[in-house]
Structure formats: structure tokens, C-alpha cells
Amino acid sequence: MSEKTFLVEIGTEELPPKALRSLAESFAANFTAELDNAGLAHGTVQWFAAPRRLALKVANLAEAQPDREIEKRGPAIAQAFDAEGKPSKAAEGWARGCGITVDQAERLTTDKGEWLLYRAHVKGESTEALLPNMVATSLAKLPIPKLMRWGASDVHFVRPVHTVTLLLGDKVIPATILGIQSDRVIRGHRFMGEPEFTIDNADQYPEILRERGKVIADYEERKAKIKADAEEAARKIGGNADLSESLLEEVASLVEWPVVLTAKFEEKFLAVPSEALVYTMKGDQKYFPVYANDGKLLPNFIFVANIESKDPQQIISGNEKVVRPRLADAEFFFNTDRKKRLEDNLPRLQTVLFQQQLGTLRDKTDRIQALAGWIAEQIGADVNHATRAGLLSKCDLMTNMVFEFTDTQGVMGMHYARHDGEAEDVAVALNEQYQPRFAGDDLPSNPVACALAIADKMDTLAGIFGIGQHPKGDKDPFALRRAALGVLRIIVEKNLNLDLQTLTEEAVRLYGDKLTNANVVDDVIDFMLGRFRAWYQDEGYTVDTIQAVLARRPTRPADFDARMKAVSHFRTLEAAAALAAANKRVSNILAKSDEVLSDRVNASTLKEPEEIKLAMQVVVLRDKLEPYFAEGRYQDALVELAELREPVDAFFDKVMVMVDDKELRINRLTMLEKLRELFLRVADISLLQ
């Protein structure tokens, strides 16, 4: 069967840059699934994406589906005919479904009986006939949150469509896709190359688009070119470009023919905190800031034009003129804000609502102030500095700078606090209170910052759960999942002596009578323990290890972490599987018994050597391991408990637990309970698979 290259290109108006990659990848994944479902043999499916096009190129696509043999088994012969040998209704209905009569059916005979059988040779459908619907279906499944409709058409897509190219080898596949008749016309760059041209063969793509249309259709190629050229441009001015992955992706999605240029701004603007300047350059203008080798911002930026100009200096000057007013605004806001102290913004917080049932930002500030001080006392941080940081924590939200450049919240609080002469750990805490902002982000760097960050997040968790607005499905408007994980990370990775129980109770207490959920404390703790599950799964821990620890519901995050590491290590021991099985057996025996057990094992009642030996070792280990448990040395404790494998195995091999003698039975059950309690001091080992 011959093979050909297939090309589909959808020419559109400018596509959303932040969604371009996902649209192209989904298009490729959807179409690959369509090919596979249809049984069409094919080679690599390569996707292309530029601001005004989505395209796929499929190598070695078979020209038709393979022929196939189909078999459909019908009713058993006994049910297919009546006593007179006439076909039953079931047989006739089956035959109609197969497009035959009963007398045309074959018979299938096996050692289990005889059935009617329909067998047919089905010729594979041509690829040309299948492709239009496959393309349309793949486009319909794209993850587009908001569709557009244009003109008088009822067609909906992410952006208006102007061209549809469908080529199988050198042949146009006739189809109407998204209201457009397919042909071999492709549009080039808006301002360079040929605005429109025809493509003779699918194999010519994307080279013909580069040569004649001045468009680099390969997304990764554009991105790599921007990165390499920007790094070289920064090197030429003695700096390093801030090429964040997200901005690189966005810029690569905005240009069809990237040309990297370098511009500058006035050095006087460097007196403004660099974060505000960078926010303007990256967020508003999509420029790449440039830093010196010592990490200081340089008065330069790198940007990407979408055209090769005979006079690039004109483009550079234009971009410098565009960015200057934004930097001047930042300078003005910075100087204006510093004319009063950060603390002077406190009264204005009373005018901003945090949440209708939970009060204003000033109310939240008061709670954070008290909670940060309480946390500081628990972890040995400076209480006065923590309460001061809590008082100032939201004041920068009322400044001109943060109002205009919202992503500078926190960092501007730090700069203004330093200007006011606040303690350095207080100033740093104002910036770091929102950390970690995302997975893998840095944690607060000092104890005061840790106290403030935990207080801010716990206040939100307690308040939102307290009014019954916990996350549902994918909806999490208050980012409670991120807040919970942030609290856990800070406590675990900083090894802080905090208990979720008392921490949540204190956060709830500070709300007074505002909360309506009577179970708020348990709900918050359960939610946070659930985030532990997700965290440790991401870290590579097995689900049953997590469940074994969760079963004990330890509410000290650092303690939870120690148990996780202990159980994970325990699983590597030779005795682990046998002891997990023994714990499961003990758990089942105890669960089935409704007898009242003794407080201790009666040594005089023990009879068999195996139970005497096991009872002695349980007593010895109970006394020996008490300080281990008190100090959180769970790994050492489980290593010691692993020594019980041999006496436990011997006990179950030689000793009957559920004997008729009640005193003996209860004594043995009591011993098993004491054995299980030792393991439960760490985790429920019986849950390990």
C-alpha cells in the first residue's frame, strides 16, 4: 500500500498567544487518535503553530485502511430455530443486523456448542474520504474556553478562519472545514514575503512558508532562535537576559519572523525598585530585562520584532518611547508613596473588603498580627517583629505602585518598610509572606517571615472553611490548595514545632463569632492532610505508604514527614512484607473479636514457648522504644520492630489464638493488641501492600 505525506493548515486571525502551544499540541494529539482509531498506518505527526496558523504534517500516511475480516456470532442453534426448523425472531433480527438472511449464515462449531456465524471481508475505506471528518473532529475537540462567531456564519472557533489547506501528497482533499472550502492556498507574513501563494505538495511544508511567506511555522524553532539571539544580544552589552520560560513561550507565540533587538532606558529609572521596572518590561511590554553579572538590573532591555526592517533603529526608538512613560509612572508612584510611612495606609484597609462575611482587609490584618505573634512564640521567632510584620502586611496594597502594578505586592512593602527604618526581618517578611507562590518556589528565609506567611495562609483557610466555601472540583477562588500546601511546606522544610490542631484552633478563635461552620477545625485539618497526600505522591511515595501514615492522623507536619520517611525506609527491610501481613492478620483478628481485653498481658497465663518469647520481646521493645517515639525517631523504632518478624511468624505457626479457654484467649488477644499498638505508634503497617 502506497504512503503519502498529509498536510492540514488552518489559517486564522491572531490566535491567543498563551494558548497557542496547547492548541497545537491538542490538535496533534486529537488527530493522532483519529488516525489510530481509524486503523490508518502513519509515521510522525508533527505540529506547527504560529500567530495566524495551526498546522499538522503527517509522514507516511497510508492511502487507505487495511482490508479486514469481520465475524459476528449469532444465537446458539438451539435458540436460532424452533421445533419445526424455522428461524426464531432472535435469529432473524440478528441476520437483519448483519444484512443477510438466516439461511445465508455460516455455522460456528466448538466443543461448547454450535452458533450462527456471519463472516465478511470488508474493504478498507480510502484515506481521502476519511480525512475531512477526522480534521473537523480534531478541531472540535480543542480546549477552547471561549469560542468566537464571525460574519453571518454560524461557525464557531477560537478566532476567525480564512484559509484551510488539505493536501495528501500533491492532491487537494475537497472539504469544507469551519465554513471554509479547502484548497492549496497559504498566506504568508502580513508585511514581508508573498502575502498569498499556492503549495504544490505537502512535502514542501514548512520550508515553502519560510522561503516565500517569511514565516517560521515551527514553534520550537522560533523559540530557540529567540533564546539564542537574545542571549547573544545580552552578551554583547555585558549582561545576561532574563529569559523566563513563560515569557519566551508567549513571545514565540506573538511573532512569525522573530528579529531580536536591544534598546535602553534612562539610568535614572534604576533608582526605582527593579521589581517594578521588570514588571513593566515583562508584563506590559513583553520585553526581556538584562542584568549585570552581579545581579543588578542594567538600563537595557531586549525585545523581539516581527519584521526585518531596513532601519532597525527606528523600531528600537519606537519601543524606547513606548516604555519610557511606563517607567516614569513607576518612578512617580515610588516617590509619591514614600512621602508617607507604610503604616499610614492602615486606615484605608478598612475600606477594602476581604470577604463579605469575614470583614475588611483591616480586620484580616488584625487577625494576622495576632496569629503571627502566636506562631512566632511557638517557633522561637521574635514576637515583636512578627506582630509588627503582621500589622504592616497588607499596607502596601493601598499604595499607588501596587495599585498600578499589582504583581509588586509584597516586594514594594519590603522597600517601603526599609525606607521607613523598619527592622530588616520585618521588611523581608512583607515580601516573603506570599511564598511559596507555586510548586517549587522558595520558602520564607527567616523565622519572622515564616510566622507571617503561615499566619496569612491559615487566616484565609480558617475563614473560608469557616463559612462553608471550601474548594469544589476545579474551583478554588481563594487558592486554598496552594495556601494549605504552602503552610505544610514551610513547617516541614523549616522543621517548625507547630501542630495543625492548635494552629487551626488559634486561627479560628481569632474570628470570634464570624464563622458558621461548627466543624471548621476538623475540616481544615482534613483538607491539609489531603494536600499531604498529593504532595507525597508527587515526591514519589507510594499510595499505601501515605495511607499507612494518614491512618494515624498525625497533625504535626514535621512529625508526619518523619513517619513517611520511616515507613518508606521500613519497606526496604527484608522483614517488611511479613510484618505488614502479620499486622493485617492481627488487625482482622482483633476486629472480629468483641471481647473486652485486659490492660496488660498476664505472664502466668502464657503457655506455649512461642507466645512466651513474643510477649517478652513486646514488653522489652515497649520500654526500649518509648524514648524513640517521644523524640520522633520513627525510622529507628521500625528497624527495632523489624526484629519481631521471627517470633511473630513462630507465634502464628504454633499458637492458636481463638481457643475455647476464655482466659487464655483474652490473654493472647491482649498480647496481639499490645504488639499492634507498638507499630501504630508510627503508622498502620497493615495497610502496606
From Swiss-Prot:
Its EC number is 6.1.1.14. It is an enzyme of class 6 (ligase). GO terms for molecular function: arginine-tRNA ligase activity; ATP binding; glycine-tRNA ligase activity. Keywords: Aminoacyl-tRNA synthetase, ATP-binding, Cytoplasm, Ligase, Nucleotide-binding, Protein biosynthesis. Coiled coil: none annotated. It catalyses: tRNA(Gly) + glycine + ATP = glycyl-tRNA(Gly) + AMP + diphosphate. Its main location: cytoplasm. It comes from the Bacteria. Tetramer of two alpha and two beta subunits. PANTHER family: GLYCINE--TRNA LIGASE, CHLOROPLASTIC_MITOCHONDRIAL 2 (PTHR30075:SF2), GLYCYL-TRNA SYNTHETASE (PTHR30075). This is Glycine--tRNA ligase beta subunit. The lineage of its organism: Bacteria, Pseudomonadati, Pseudomonadota, Gammaproteobacteria, Enterobacterales. The gene is glyS.
